[in-house]
Amino acid sequence: MNYFKKSILGLIVFSSTGSFAQNNYDKSMAAMMKGDYKTAVTQLEKADAKTRDDAKVLKMLGYSYFQNGDFEKCISTYTRLISLTPNEVSAYYYRGKARLNVANDPKESLSDMRENFYTSAIKDFTKAIEISGDEDTQMLQNRGLAYKDYAIFKSYKAKKGAERTACVTLFNNSIADFQKLLTLQPLRKDIIDWITYDKAQIASLK
């Protein structure tokens, strides 16, 4: 079960019994249970306008933006949530995934901001690991993928020895996260395949 699903169960119970429940919030919960995240966003934006900086609303709004593929708004919403609750693991997780999705978007191929999105995603996953512990397989996997994608991005322009060395370092960081994950979840073929891929890329850079 992912971080949002773990936390949302408590919010569902709370919203159905606590004084926090409001019309827009209740409608958003019903929509999310049906997988209708567009309606959820509409209702949560109204709730956010009425009760600014409510952590429960922001958590659900950020997740709904993510599910709708609106990654820019997802990032800004989770940034607001982190300013209120700095140790909210799910906020770093989904903000990191949103940043990585933006960085990997073909539409961003000419954007000078791509590198910033890669490094920011890695920082988010690293912060989440600091909070949740270094045996968090979900975070290790996503940071490993972020290192890999960032290394691929940098390798396209790597001409000089120092640039190639920097790419190798990123691929090695990816391998380290994947190998740590394998000690916790052995025989993950997808992870074994990614390690093989990383090693092949390192060989091509030498």
Predicted regions and their residues:
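Helix-start (N-cap) detector for alpha-helical repeat units in TPR-like alpha-solenoids
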Residues: 24, 55-56, 89-90, 135-138, ...
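Conserved structural position within tetratricopeptide repeats
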Residues: 46-49, 79-83, 123-131, 176, ...
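Short coil turns that delineate tetratricopeptide repeat
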Residues: 52, 86, 133-134, 186
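Short coil/turn linking the two alpha-helices of tandem helical-hairpin repeats
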Residues: 69, 96, 101-111, 144, ...
